């Protein structure tokens, strides 16, 4: 099913769009003529990207700085869009982060913030914006999950479980919406060159210890695959042949074999054992 056609009063809401995959998805949608609303905490970065995509593609690019761990901020986001006269025809739930290391050494505040961003915000924004899409008989939702969704992930236990939730939720929501004119796609990238792991306390070298470089995919390629999958109405998109193979292997292989291997190779667990 084609994406909803661009309109002056419609927008593609992209969370986590100040950098990485989110910024690349916003640029890809703008390249296709869609106005975008960029949402993240860093207003300075959002403004710079908004200027860039507006100048490059001649689309309306809005900026709303918000902390999506806060449910009040999510409701305020909906109200602000209404005040600006915009309806959300494309929703991209991309905001997210990971914690790394064994659970017994984790920080409670960080673990809960991750769940609020990676899980709660996805559910809340779908609950807020999907009803309007159904009423208008047009809309598309792209939820960023991960290849970590296909098997438990020692060393990132909460993150893997969060992304498994996003994948399951997206597939169920897509089935519920069949025939309404609204589609749902789960984007499941493998490792992406975005500084994501480094922001979680690991260097790129440490993060790539357990994953060969040929599995890493540029953010722009992930974004293009995600938007193409969204336009085609695919329920799941896994960019990169190596990552598709890895996801299937992780899903079908006996967990009694997979989990000890993952635990032994995860760089955060290696680091914890050394420390």
Named regions from a protein language model:
Residues 18-19:
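Conserved glycine-rich cofactor-binding loop
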Residues 32-49:
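Conserved glycine-rich Rossmann-like NAD(P)H-binding loop of the short-chain dehydrogenase/reductase
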Residues 94-99:
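Conserved NAD(P)H cofactor-binding loop of Rossmann-fold oxidoreductase domains
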Residues 102-115:
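Substrate-binding pocket helix/loop in short-chain dehydrogenase/reductase
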Residues 126, 162:
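Active-site helix of classical SDR
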Residues 146:
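Residue(s) in the substrate-gating loop at a strand-loop-helix junction
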Residues 179-243, 256-259, 270:
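SDR active-site lid
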